[in-house]
From Swiss-Prot:
This is Ribosome maturation factor RimM. One of its GO terms (molecular function) is ribosome binding. The PRC barrel domain binds ribosomal protein uS19. Its main location: cytoplasm.
Length: 178
């Protein structure tokens, strides 16, 4: 395993190692990609955890009940594999597929100012949650916000009116009292 990572700013978290599988050094992985198997399309990963960074190569992977089971090059022992539990799986941003003009990766939405139809600033998108019905944006107050409330807004066409990545703004149809 090589220890020369990509620049941290250029990396996107696409999964997380959460446990070991068997005695041959396989690890259990939760994939943030959709579908989850898309994570296996990236043969080289940068692993990060508490200041530690490792470069690894994917040998094989398969689906399981709670995610993926993955074999990494040079990882042949259960005890060694256990040391990777908790590591984030990252890939360079440049490897992500291009999206349609009206589609966005979650990382692109994080940090956008959220302004409603009445020009009221709610705050900034902190992160998104995956729910059964639709994704939900967690909007936390920032300097100049209408109030100090954290808001949960659905990421739907009915709520999100416009996104301007260059301006760093998302316009929404949402009442300030909700």
């Amino acid at each position: 395993m090589n220890a020369t990572p990509e620049k941290a700013d250029d990396l996107i978290v696409v999964g997380k190692i959460f446990s070991v599988h068997g005695v041959r050094g396989e690890v259990k992985v939760y994939s943030f990609t959709d579908p989850i198997e898309n994570l296996l399309d990236y043969p080289r990963w940068t692993l990060r955890h508490e200041g530690k960074v490792k470069q690894v190569e994917l040998v094989s992977g398969r689906g399981s009940q709670k995610g993926l089971v993955v074999k990494l090059k040079g990882l042949d022992d259960r005890d060694e594999a256990r040391l990777l539990s908790g590591f984030e799986i990252c890939i360079p941003r440049s490897l992500l597929p291009n999206l349609a003009a009206d589609e966005y990766y979650w990382y692109q939405l994080q940090g956008l100012k959220v302004i409603n139809q009445d020009e009221q600033l709610f705050g900034k998108v902190d992160h998104l949650l995956e729910t059964g019905a639709n994704d939900v944006m967690v909007v936390k107050p920032c300097a100049g916000s209408l109030d100090d409330r954290e808001r949960l807004l659905p990421y739907t066409a009915q709520c999100v009116l416009a996104i301007d990545l260059e301006a760093g703004v998302m316009r929404v149809e949402w009442d300030a009292d909700f």
